[in-house]
Design a protein with these regions (language model features):
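Hydrophobic core segments of transmembrane alpha-helices in multi-pass, intramembrane catalytic enzymes
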Residues: 27-38, 83-95, 154-170, 202-214, ...
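Short, aromatic-rich membrane-interface segments at the entry and exit
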Residues: 23-35, 80-83, 179-181, 202-206, ...
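Alpha-helical transmembrane segments of multi-pass inner-membrane proteins
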Residues: 12, 108-140, 151-219, 229-241, ...
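Long extracytoplasmic/lumenal interhelical loops at the membrane interface
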Residues: 261-275, 283, 287-327
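Transmembrane signal-anchor hairpin modules in multi-pass inner-membrane enzymes, especially those
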Residues: 1-79, 101, 105-116, 170-181, ...
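Membrane helix-loop boundary segments at the extracytoplasmic
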Residues: 17-24, 324-327, 356-394
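A membrane-periplasm/extracellular boundary helix in multi-pass inner-membrane enzymes
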Residues: 218-261, 275-283, 291
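Hydrophobic transmembrane alpha-helices and their immediate junctions
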Residues: 215, 326-366
Length: 409
């Protein structure tokens, strides 16, 4: 019976990585199934040892503990507090995953399941140019128009950028020439889907981030500098060839210039929030205003004719500012600790692929958090917390051996 439960748990975890890029509802159901199966299968001692050895797990638990602490001094309504507890619940769930994804076989299966899911999204994105797919979110055929299949283009671009990194790493590590060609093709098609088939400006930036991580983490010596120069030239060519990318950057520049007068645009709204949120933080710099408090407290600083509408009170489009407003320097530091622990785990692994992917994930999370609430927004938080759990498990499983000191006579 126990072996069957463990098999079901492994299947549920694999299913989670296969389906979360496409269905939040199914991912949430699998989360519940995983928790129940995790409780049934027991083996708590071994799981505790895995959690104990994983600094990413401790960082995630610390961050959620700070969210719980914020309940006791928050002026927010119970609806807002409950919303935050639910949103950040994926942090302790990630720790459950870190204790359960114990074998190399299961870890590889989970990563490959995610790659398969994103492969389906990638194929669908390209087919969307010519055919109106019934499962696609967008229904506008053609080239140089935005296409996203599930959810929103922001989250699709985040995950697609990570797929580019996976494909590039596997290109240089695959021993088979045909496999190298196939993975290189995946990286190219995924990159073009971001630059020419999406209107997400953050996606363009995140693509540059993963390319930089790949060049400076996976390559060495002359190959590294050759790739860096070639990459810069290619990005200039891409910018020149993508009308969609040029239009989006020109729009961003225009919105930035008019930010003082037009605060309802995407860029103007962010700039306005980046100005008023620090004023809120300054009132309670150490512990913040409490869990869920941003939604109501920020309204005291809003002075625009439209009032404190949902676009302002939802979140400040910056995870660092969000934690600082609700949880002060303590929450801000805990989030930095999470990012640093991911990078530290990457440095401890003996597997070059895992090292590059974990550094890339940490970089994606950090950069995306400058313009989005990465751990609060539903689809983004699914990706970052699950992948953080998986890659930290793989880094722990393949960690470098501790050098032994030879005794001298």
């Amino acid at each position: 019976m126990l072996k069957k439960s463990e098999a079901f748990l492994s299947a549920a975890i694999t299913g989670l990585f296969l389906f979360f890029p496409m269905s939040l509802g199914l991912a949430s159901s699998l989360m519940l199934a995983i928790v129940l199966l995790w409780l049934v299968t027991g083996n708590l001692k071994a799981r505790w040892l895995r959690i104990k050895a994983n600094p990413v797990a401790w960082a995630a638990l610390l961050l959620y503990a700070i969210v719980l602490l914020g309940i006791f001094y928050s002026p927010a309504s119970w609806n807002d507090i409950g919303l935050h507890l639910t949103k950040y619940l994926k942090l302790p769930f990630a720790v459950i995953l870190m204790s359960a994804i114990a074998t190399d076989k299961l870890q590889k299966r989970c990563l490959n399941a995610f790659v398969m899911a994103m492969g389906f999204v990638l194929i669908s994105t390209w087919l969307n140019i010519w055919w109106d797919l019934p499962w696609s979110k967008t229904h506008n055929q053609g080239w140089n128009v935005t296409h996203h299949v599930f959810g929103d283009y922001i989250t699709q671009n985040i995950m697609m950028a990570f797929l580019v990194l996976v494909a590039l790493v596997r290109t240089i590590r695959s021993p088979n020439t045909w496999h190298k060609i196939a993975w290189a093709a995946v990286a190219l098609l995924a990159s073009i889907s971001i630059t020419h088939l999406s209107e997400g400006r953050v996606g363009y930036v995140l693509l540059w981030v993963v390319l930089a991580v790949f060049v400076f983490s996976a390559l060495k010596g002359r190959a590294m500098w050759l790739a860096a120069v070639s990459g810069a030239v290619i990005m200039v060519v891409v910018l020149a060839s993508s009308g969609l990318m040029r239009d989006r950057f020109e729009l961003a520049f225009t919105e930035m210039q008019r930010a003082d007068a037009e605060k309802m645009t995407s860029v103007g709204n962010r700039i306005y929030l980046y100005k008023i949120t620090p004023q809120l933080i300054a009132e309670a710099p150490l512990l913040g205003h409490g869990t869920g408090s941003y939604h109501s407290e920020i309204c005291r600083f809003v002075n625009i004719p439209q009032g404190c509408h949902g676009w302002i009170s939802w979140h400040p489009h910056n995870q660092f500012l969000f934690f600082a407003a609700d949880h002060g320097a303590l929450g801000f530091a805990a989030y930095l600790f999470l990012l640093i622990s991911m990078a530290w785990m990457a440095r401890q692994t003996a597997d070059p692929e895992i090292r590059v992917l974990l550094i890339g994930l940490a970089a994606l999370l950090a950069v995306n958090s400058l313009t989005n609430a990465s751990l609060w927004s539903a689809r983004e938080s699914h990706f970052f917390t699950y992948m953080m759990a998986l890659l930290s498990c793989r880094a722990l499983y393949h960690r470098k051996p501790v050098p032994t000191v030879q005794a001298t006579a």
